[in-house]
């Protein structure tokens, strides 16, 4: 994945955290990563572990490995302009029980910064305590979990609620990426709270 930002684009000068671990759905990491680069931002891969992480393709086949830029324990939300959370069942299941990841996610909401989550990534939003009263979407199997956590779940390709962008699956990536760039370009959302 490229890390060079386009200097003449709407996100020039912005830095975006991508929170992922082993088992991340590869296209849900690489597609938004390339979209923010094309829009001028610098993406940073944040993970519970240092070194590299290995992606999956459709949760079954091993994908490529990606170099971690910083650990979630060392990362601080104030150093980023927004957060993207790719899915992948294994990735999301590991991330949602990681206390450092939960705190990192919650800090973006407390600082009113844009957050984007696709597929199974909203599991971590539940554990971070930031979905109650929110309108969002996810992979359909998370519907009950999100409703039980107080969210209003809808079946739409992309949903934006005060700086929180969510989508259902890789099929929604074009719409997801466009909204990620739009929300990041708008900057802080004062109604984005934990």
Language model segments and positions:
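Anionic-ligand binding patches
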Residues: 136
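Extended, subdomain-level signal for the structured scaffold at the beginning of enzyme domains
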Residues: 1-111, 115, 124-132, 143-194
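Catalytic nucleophile serine of serine hydrolases
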Residues: 119
């Amino acid at each position: 994945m490229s890390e060079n930002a386009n200097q003449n684009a709407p996100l020039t000068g912005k830095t975006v955290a991508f929170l992922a671990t082993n088992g991340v759905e590869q296209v849900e990491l690489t597609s938004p990563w390339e979209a923010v680069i094309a829009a001028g931002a610098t993406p940073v891969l944040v993970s519970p572990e240092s070194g590299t992480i290995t992606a999956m393709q459709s949760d079954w086949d091993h994908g490529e490995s990606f170099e971690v830029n910083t650990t979630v324990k060392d990362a601080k939300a104030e150093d980023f302009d927004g957060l993207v959370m790719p899915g992948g069942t294994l990735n999301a299941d590991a991330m949602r029980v990681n206390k450092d990841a939960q705190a990192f996610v919650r800090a973006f909401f407390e600082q009113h910064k844009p957050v984007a989550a696709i597929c199974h990534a909203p599991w971590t939003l539940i554990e971070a305590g930031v979905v109650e009263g929110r309108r969002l979407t996810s992979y359909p199997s998370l519907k009950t979990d999100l409703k039980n956590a107080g969210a209003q779940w809808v079946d739409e390709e992309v949903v934006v609620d005060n700086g929180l962008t969510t989508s259902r699956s890789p099929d929604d990536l074009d719409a997801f990426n466009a909204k990620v760039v739009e929300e990041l370009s708008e900057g802080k959302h004062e109604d984005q709270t934990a």
